[in-house]
């Protein structure tokens, strides 16, 4: 039985009970991390208990990054022999196909020659959209026609939009809410770089999506991205603070040829390291080991 995250932990235990089944528990993030590295009470405490229970009951625990593995071991006392790491994967072929970037940009009120930054993810404190907005004034000083597209929804969306208005940068921002399917893939392919400014990031699937679309990333050095991003090869690592984010984006916008080269390297990484065929073989190896 292979369960993913706390929601599936009770089902894993029920199927396993009295049947002699081996079980594996994969954790993609922790409640502690999703709460901004805080241990809250109430429902959050119940979720943490299910995470602990899944780790305790299973024969093997898989984390999606070494950083997350260390966090899980610290939180739930998982022994080394039981814990391992398998990165997330992606079907990079889903991002193949030609588009007209200028046409996609026009759909969102962005000029065809405007340097464009894409943020994709939940609009919550953990993911740091407010940090990107705080970086925009620095970037506009050197690249006044830059645009920043936010694709995602969440509890911080309206607060982040108000922040953009308060800082006088709303004219450079496009808040699209939840976007999926071909519209999201086209956004990845039309942008110039993808920013991942998270305060806590167990892995960062968005990075693999950006690379599959051939785009460089400006990604936090906190958590999983610090392991998978090769600095100045397929993106830039930054600290989760506005000045560092501005430096990363500004560096890419200073040399678009170099930025495109990083994006091509990202595509190579998606194909050679993170394809589902490779990840599936690693999971099968765990199945055969228990």
Residue spans for each PLM region:
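Aromatic "clamp/platform" in nucleotide-sugar-dependent glycosyltransferases that forms part
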Residues: 199
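A short helix/loop element that forms part of the nucleotide-sugar donor recognition site in Leloir-type
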Residues: 42, 96-110
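Conserved donor-binding/catalytic core segment of Leloir-type glycosyltransferases
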Residues: 111-127, 133-136
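Short alpha-helical donor nucleotide-sugar binding micro-motif in glycosyltransferases
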Residues: 178-179, 186-191
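Carbohydrate-associated surface elements
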Residues: 67, 89
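Conserved acidic donor-binding segment of nucleotide-sugar-dependent glycosyltransferases
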Residues: 231-232, 236-242, 251-256
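Nucleotide-sugar donor phosphate/pyrophosphate-binding loop at the beta->alpha transition
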Residues: 22, 32-53
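Short hydrophobic beta-strand element within catalytic cores of glycosyltransferases
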Residues: 207, 216-219, 229
